[in-house]
Structures are given as C-alpha cells and as structure tokens.
Amino acid sequence: MKKKLVVLGLLAVVLVLVIVGLCLWLPSASKEPDNHVYTRAAVAADAKQCSKIGRDALRDGGSAVDAAIAALLCVGLMNAHSMGIGGGLFLTIYNSTTRKAEVINAREVAPRLAFATMFNSSEQSQKGGLSVAVPGEIRGYELAHQRHGRLPWARLFQPSIQLARQGFPVGKGLAAALENKRTVIEQQPVLCEVFCRDRKVLREGERLTLPQLADTYETLAIEGAQAFYNGSLTAQIVKDIQAAGGIVTAEDLNNYRAELIEHPLNISLGDVVLYMPSAPLSGPVLALILNILKGYNFSRESVESPEQKGLTYHRIVEAFRFAYAKRTLLGDPKFVDVTEVVRNMTSEFFAAQLRAQISDDTTHPISYYKPEFYTPDDGGTAHLSVVAEDGSAVSATSTINLYFGSKVRSPVSGILFNNEMDDFSSPSITNEFGVPPSPANFIQPGKQPLSSMCPTIMVGQDGQVRMVVGAAGGTQITTATALAIIYNLWFGYDVKRAVEEPRLHNQLLPNVTTVERNIDQAVTAALETRHHHTQIASTFIAVVQAIVRTAGGWAAASDSRKGGEPAGY
C-alpha cells in the first residue's frame, strides 16, 4: 500500500512537472521573446500591431514581400500621418534563392499639367490639392506582389480591413502628429471627422476607426490595384483632388506605372555589400557618407575614450556635410543626367578626396563644402524591415511627405493624399541660405522629386542577409540610416542599441549640427571645440527600424522614438 502511494505520489510530481514545463514552453511559441531575437523570421514596423500582421503573413507561408505589404497596409492606418495609399514608396528586395537584389520604385510623379513655376510659396506646395502628386503606393504593392507574392492579394488586406472597421487605440507617433497639427485638423471638418472626438484631436490611447478607408481597402482587395488607377475608385480620387484645387487627372492615374530596377546601387564595406536605391532617392548620399568614413577604419576603440569619441563624431558630421553638399545635384534620372554625379558619389577615389579635406581640429564655413544648389527638406514617412524564413528580405520606406500630407482627405474613400510636390525645388521660392534652388529637382510633368529615403539591405560574402535597415524622418533619414549602420557594423553595438543610441544630424544648410537631448556631453563639447554650431533637437532625430543577423537568430528593433515594436518567431 505504502509502495503504491509512493508510486502515485511520484506520478503526481512528474505530471505537475510536465504541466509546468508545457505551460512554460507553450507560450514561448506564441509569446514574443523580450529581447526580440527570433530564430526564423522577423518584422520591424513602427507600430506593434503592424509588425504582428506582417509576422502572421509569414507564418501563413507568405513571402517577405507579402509580409511587407500586409504590414504597410496596417501602418497606413495606425500611422496615417506618415504614409498610406495616397502616397508612394520604394522597396529594396533581396531574394535569398537567386542572391539578387532589386528595387521597386513607386514614388509619386508630378501630374502632366504641372510646370516648373507653378508654386510661388511653400504654403501652396505644402497644403491643398495642388500639392498632391500622382500616388504610386498601390501600383508598387501590385508589382512587388506579382513578382514575389505567395499569399493571395486579398489576404494581405484582410487584417487591416478588420482593424480599420473595429478601430484601434491611437499610438505614440500618431498622437504626437495630431497634437502637432491640432489647429489644422480641428478646423477642417473632413479631417476632424475621423481624427477628433468632440471636436478635439484624439489623444494617445483613444480609439480611432477609419470606416471609409476600410471600404476602400475592401474594394482594392477584391478588384486589385486597377480599382485605384483605372477602375471603380478612379473618378472619386480625381474628384477629391480637383475639388481641393489639384490638377491630377484620370489620365495621370491611368498612366502611372511602378518601375522595377534590376540593378540597384551597391557599395562594398569590407566583407559586406550594401544595396539601396539610386536617384531620385538618397542611396548615393548614404554611399558617399559611408565611403568617406570607411577610410578611418572605425571600430569599438573609436568611441572608447571621450577624446576618441569626440573626434569620431566630428568626422561623421563632416562626412554628412560633404555628402549633403553633393545631394543638391541629384534629380530624377529619367529627366536629368545624374550618371556622373552618382558615379562620383559612389566612388572610393572621390570619397578619399573629400576625406582628405576633413580637418580633424575644426569644421569650416558652408562655402568650403561647395554646395552648388539648395534642395528643400522632405517630410515624415514610415519605414519597415522584414526577413522571411528563407532568408529573403525587404526594406521598405513609404511616405505621404509632411504630417497628414496635403491635409486633403476624401470624405468618400477616406484616402489621405500626399503633398509630394513640395519635395521639388521651385525657381521662384527662395531660401534663407542665399544658395540657388536645384535645377535638377525642378518640376516637370511625370517627374519624381528628390527624396532622402534610402531603404537598405546589407549582404555578406556568403550571400546571406546581414542587416535590413532604413529610417523615417524627412531630410534626417539618410544620416540616421548611416548612423545605425556605423553603430552596428563598426562600433559593434547590438541592433537595439544601434537604433536607440542618441543621434546627431547636419545637412550643411542650415549650418547647424542638431543633437538629441540625451547625447553624450563629451560629443557636444568636442563639436563645439571644433567650431560646430550645435542645437538640441526639439523632439528627436528620425525613426529607424532594423533587423540584424546574430548567432542567436534575427535580432529586430523598432525605434522607441515612435513607439514601435517588432514581431517574429
């Protein structure tokens, strides 16, 4: 009897241990690991729910492109101030099977009735129908899906249709943008209809529903991209833009095509290759920054002592200044011959010549960097990074330009339209720097404006992805992307630190180095000793999403500056 009780007791103990073990193990299959390192696949978007939607697409057997599209459709709701189907995007895609990278260009174009001198003030180019360029977002999704999609097109829309209908709590990024644009939104009934409660803008945590956009997503899911460009949604889109004073026509939409770029810009940094878009995006600017800096052979030691750290950051800022001086020569290659400019900006010899002009003890006046022209700042944006189970990756940056784009929202379709026309240079709009506007970036029908976006994928010699990275934040995008790469690749910071580490930014015009509030005082002191004008950023500098290959799997980071969080499995 005693023996029987002992056996039963042991069995009970074993059973308890098994149950406890299962309880501990089972959630880990569905629960996110706290360190955001995933063994098989990862998505880093700027909203947690959107990272999860992307992850679920991967779990359902979707490709990296499927996950990116599903997540972007979600970001267009949850961070509607940054991006959406009324905007445009660029995708850098790496296929692990073929070991080839490609870029899909779905940036907006100037309408066919546009002309170089159409704007006399920034007010016109930033707000209202005239500031709207022909949206490319949905054509971009379509081309990417045709080439790399595994899941049905409609499946990619389903989670976001549900989200838009049921509503969701306003997140950190959207809440900040609503507060920033409070006056405009509260005065405009069509915007206030969705973004206000009791005629006051929604605050973080309050519920936002987007029923009209849910209907539009449903139409696109069923009818495909054609619905937007040459189908059931087209007439209303044109009507909405023209009612707000715009010049986009049905013909503009009918004629819009996303472009496949089979040989994207690439540069080598030691044993890795970086793939990124060329002009009119800022891949060449990123390439020049990194090529200038690689000659310094940065390592962990470069930031060990306050003296070394100060010198290192000074050199980084000087590289920014030289690269941004050359940025003003870039434009849409279909309209301007930028071959030689891009060749120079990606040449190690050219970078070495500029590096030789960097003085370690001082910065220089603006004229020293030889800026030939001035290009306007670009706006917000959203970035996401994806790595799928097969090792393929997508780096996607999407935008409607400034917060809430043109502020033109359709009461029927719910689409919020871009103000991408503001990214062009205008001969008649002067700037305070006394530098002429850039002719390479003047408006022409069908032309794409210059952008700071640079979605990047880094690949090792073994053909495996090492890093997927990009940023949002207007003109600060390129420097923030460069810093994330420098922090991880050269300083050896893990991905979380590479994304969270305080940043600084200098674009030559204005002649100021902006630093984040929490940056190391030694850095600011070293810059000021070298005659840099520093100022503290009013909020933060850009928003980065990155995924890095580590020994333990895919380490993913979504920038806390916008309140995002990655997902994976």
Curated annotation (Swiss-Prot):
Q: Which residues lie on this side of the membrane: Extracellular?
A: 27-569
Q: Give the Cytoplasmic membrane side ranges.
A: 1-4
Record flagged with keyword Lipid biosynthesis = no
Disorder association: Glutathionuria: A very rare, autosomal recessive metabolic disorder characterized by the presence of glutathione in the urine, due to generalized gamma-glutamyl transpeptidase deficiency. Most patients manifest mild to moderate intellectual disability, and behavioral disturbance. Seizures, tremor, marfanoid features and strabismus are observed in some patients.
Its placement in the membrane is given as:
Single-pass type II membrane protein
Chain residues that bind L-glutamate: R107, T399, I400, N401, D423, S451, S452, G474
Q: What is the effect of changing R107 to Q/H?
A: Abolishes gamma-glutamyltranspeptidase activity
Catalytic activity line of the entry: an N-terminal (5-L-glutamyl)-[peptide] + an alpha-amino acid = 5-L-glutamyl amino acid + an N-terminal L-alpha-aminoacyl-[peptide]; glutathione + H2O = L-cysteinylglycine + L-glutamate; an S-substituted glutathione + H2O = an S-substituted L-cysteinylglycine + L-glutamate; leukotriene C4 + H2O = leukotriene D4 + L-glutamate
Q: Pfam families, from UniProt? A: G_glu_transpept
Stated EC number for the protein is: 3.4.19.13, 2.3.2.2, 3.4.19.14
Q: How is its activity regulated?
A: Activated by autocatalytic cleavage. Inhibited by serine-borate.
- Which gene is the coding source of this polypeptide chain? GGT1
Q: Which residues are glycosylated?
A: N95, N120, N230, N266, N297, N344, N511
Task: Give TM regions.
Answer: 5-26
Q: How does it assemble?
A: Heterodimer composed of the light and heavy chains. The active site is located in the light chain.
Variant or mutagenesis effect after changing C454A: No effect on gamma-glutamyltranspeptidase activity
Instruction: Note the effect listed for S413A.
Output: No effect on gamma-glutamyltranspeptidase activity
Q: Which GO terms describe its molecular function?
A: glutathione hydrolase activity; leukotriene C4 gamma-glutamyl transferase activity; leukotriene-C(4) hydrolase; peptidyltransferase activity
Which GO cellular component does the record give, naming just one?
Answer: plasma membrane
Q: Which UniProt keywords apply?
A: Acyltransferase, Cell membrane, Disease variant, Disulfide bond, Glutathione biosynthesis, Glycoprotein, Hydrolase, Intellectual disability, Lipid metabolism, Membrane, Protease, Sialic acid, Signal-anchor, Transferase, Transmembrane, Transmembrane helix, Zymogen
Q: Report the pathway entry.
A: Lipid metabolism; leukotriene D4 biosynthesis; Sulfur metabolism; glutathione metabolism
Instruction: Explain what the record says happens when changing R150Q.
Output: No effect on gamma-glutamyltranspeptidase activity
Purpose:
Cleaves the gamma-glutamyl bond of extracellular glutathione (gamma-Glu-Cys-Gly), glutathione conjugates (such as maresin conjugate (13R)-S-glutathionyl-(14S)-hydroxy-(4Z,7Z,9E,11E,16Z,19Z)-docosahexaenoate, MCTR1) and other gamma-glutamyl compounds (such as leukotriene C4, LTC4). The metabolism of glutathione by GGT1 releases free glutamate and the dipeptide cysteinyl-glycine, which is hydrolyzed to cysteine and glycine by dipeptidases.
Q: What protein does this entry describe? A: Glutathione hydrolase 1 proenzyme
Q: How is it modified after translation?
A: N-glycosylated on both chains. Contains hexoses, hexosamines and sialic acid residues. Glycosylation profiles tested in kidney and liver tissues reveal the presence of tissue-specific and site-specific glycan composition, despite the overlap in composition among the N-glycans. A total of 36 glycan compositions, with 40 unique structures are observed. Up to 15 different glycans are observed at a single site, with site-specific variation in glycan composition. The difference in glycosylation profiles in the 2 tissues do not affect the enzyme activity.
Query: Where does this polypeptide localize?
Result: Cell membrane
- Listed InterPro entries: GGT_CS (IPR055262), GGT_lsub_C (IPR043138), GGT_peptidase (IPR000101), GGT_ssub (IPR043137), Ntn_hydrolases_N (IPR029055)
